[in-house]
Amino acid sequence: MNSWFSGFKKEKIKLEDNKFGEVDITFRHGGKGEPLLLLHGNPMSHVTWHKIVDELKSKFYVVTSDLRGYGESIGPEEGGPNHINYSFRAMADDQIRLMDKLGFKEFKVVGHDRGARTAHRMCLDFPTKVKKVAIFDIMPNRH
């Protein structure tokens, strides 16, 4: 699997002091250029992007992470009232905090399926952070 992400660094980051519970996010990052966040669908992980990251890394600084509760990322044991700790809002908050920790104040996002719903929520909750967004395999809804 490492050959799929040549030139990328794999890391895990703990996001604490969060209204949605503590979470460990696993992600890979690398490349050069504008920051681009890739968000996977259900029931996948960041590895779903392995066929395109090599092409993207020459034009973008690519970040591809596992959403909370997917892949190697670990979310809180308790889902909270109405499963708020695993909501799109919680996942959007995670990704914004991850990108902040990497030093990116604004960035582009591509999301598929559950990742697309998370990207849509990011646009609603953090409109100054998301420069452009591409979402596919969803119809945005009230979430």
Predicted region positions:
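Conserved HGGG/HGGXW glycine-rich cap/lid loop of the alpha/beta-hydrolase fold
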Residues: 26-76, 84
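Alpha/beta-hydrolase fold catalytic core
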Residues: 1-35, 58-60, 85-86
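Active-site loop/oxyanion-hole signature of alpha/beta-hydrolase fold enzymes
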Residues: 19-20, 28, 67-111, 140
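Polar/charged side chains located within well-ordered beta-strands of beta-rich proteins
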Residues: 10, 42, 68, 95, ...
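Conserved hydrolase catalytic core segment
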Residues: 102-143
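Soluble or luminal CAZymes and related metallo-dependent hydrolases
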Residues: 3-7, 44, 87-94, 114
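Short, hydrophobic alpha-helix immediately C-terminal to the catalytic nucleophile
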Residues: 50, 96, 120-124
